[in-house]
C-alpha cells in the first residue's frame, strides 16, 4: 500500500513539474515578464484593422480586441506590421504572440493554432456601378472574359481559383489591394468578405456588390496563435468566453459594424 501511495505521489509531482515547465515555456509567461503583448496586424481590413492616416495609429474591431486583452493582462499592446502573405509565418517565427482576426483555414491550421471564434463572414464579389446588369450571378462571373482580382495570402486567393476556374485571376501583393484593381479598371471584380464589402461601397460610391444569390464560403474568424503553446491558447480562449458572456463582442459589433 505504501508503495502505491509513493508511486501516486511521484506521478502527481511529475505532473506538477510538467505543468510548471509548460507555463514557464509559454508565451503567456513571457508576455507577463516582458510587459507587452505583440500583435501582428495588416492594418488594411476595414473595419477590423486600419491605420488612421492622420495619427498613424491603429484602430478597428481587432485593435479594440487586442487592446482589451492586453489591459486585462496588465501589459501594453504592441502592433507589429505584417501582410496577409506573411501573417501565418510571423506567428510561427515568433515575430508576434498573436494576430488580429483571420479566417479559419485548414491550410493555416496545419502550422498555426487558432483561438475560439467570435465572428463569422462570407465571400462576396465587388464591381463598378457602371457594370450593373452585366453580372447577376456567380455563374456570370466564371467565364474567360471576366478578370478577378484577389490579394495574395488571403483565403479568397485560393477560393477564387475554385469558384472562377474559367476566369482570369490577378493576384496583388500588399500594400496593394484587390479592390483597387477594380477601381483602376484592371479587373472586373474583386472578392472579399461581406464585412469589408459593406465598408468599401460606402467609401467608394462607384462600387457595388454584385447582386449574386447569397455569399459563398461562410467562415468563422479567430486569432492565430502558436500551434504548440496550449497554455497561451487556453488563456486566450478563456478570455474570449468571458468577454462573450459579458457582451464585449456585441459592443464591438455595434461600434464598428453599424457605422
Language-model features, listed with the residues they occupy:
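Extracytoplasmic small-molecule ligand-binding "clamshell" domains
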Residues: 25-102, 110
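A ligand-binding cleft/hinge motif common to bilobed small-molecule-binding domains
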Residues: 86, 102-111, 158-162, 183-184, ...
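Short helix-initiation/N-cap motifs at beta->coil->alpha
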Residues: 63, 79-89, 170-184, 219
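A structural signal for short loop-to-beta-strand junctions that line the ligand-binding cleft
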Residues: 28, 58, 62, 109-121, ...
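Flexible hinge/capping segments at coil-to-helix
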Residues: 129-146
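Periplasmic-binding protein-like
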Residues: 120-124, 198-241, 258-259
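Ligand-binding clefts/hinges and TM-proximal coupling segments of bilobed small-molecule sensing domains
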Residues: 26, 155-169, 209-212, 240-259
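Ligand-binding cleft/hinge of the Venus flytrap
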Residues: 49-55, 66-75, 137-142, 156-173, ...
Amino acid at each position: 500500500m505504501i508503495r502505491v501511495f509513493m508511486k501516486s505521489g511521484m506521478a502527481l509531482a511529475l505532473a506538477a513539474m510538467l505543468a510548471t515547465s509548460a507555463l514557464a515555456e509559454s508565451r503567456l509567461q513571457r508576455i507577463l515578464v516582458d510587459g507587452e503583448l505583440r500583435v501582428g496586424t495588416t492594418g488594411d481590413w476595414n473595419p477590423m484593422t486600419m491605420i488612421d492616416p492622420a495619427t498613424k495609429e491603429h484602430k478597428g474591431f481587432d485593435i479594440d480586441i487586442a487592446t482589451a486583452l492586453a489591459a486585462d493582462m496588465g501589459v501594453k499592446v504592441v502592433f507589429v506590421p505584417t501582410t496577409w502573405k506573411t501573417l501565418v509565418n510571423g506567428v510561427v517565427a515568433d515575430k508576434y504572440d498573436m494576430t488580429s482576426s483571420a479566417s479559419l483555414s485548414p491550410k493555416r491550421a496545419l502550422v498555426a493554432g487558432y483561438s475560439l471564434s467570435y465572428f463569422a463572414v462570407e465571400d462576396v464579389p465587388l464591381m463598378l456601378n457602371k457594370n450593373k446588369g452585366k453580372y447577376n450571378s456567380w455563374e456570370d462571373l466564371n467565364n474567360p472574359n471576366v478578370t478577378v482580382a484577389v490579394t495574395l495570402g488571403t483565403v479568397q486567393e485560393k477560393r477564387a481559383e475554385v469558384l472562377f476556374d474559367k476566369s482570369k485571376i490577378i493576384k496583388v501583393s500588399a500594400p496593394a489591394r484587390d479592390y483597387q484593381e477594380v477601381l483602376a479598371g484592371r479587373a472586373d471584380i474583386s472578392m472579399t468578405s461581406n464585412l469589408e464589402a459593406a465598408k468599401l461601397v460606402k467609401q467608394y460610391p462607384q462600387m457595388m456588390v454584385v447582386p449574386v444569390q447569397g455569399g459563398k464560403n461562410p467562415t468563422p474568424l479567430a486569432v492565430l496563435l502558436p500551434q504548440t503553446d496550449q497554455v497561451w491558447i487556453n488563456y486566450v480562449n478563456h478570455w474570449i468566453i468571458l468577454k462573450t458572456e459579458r457582451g464585449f463582442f456585441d459592443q464591438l459589433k455595434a461600434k464598428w459594424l453599424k457605422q
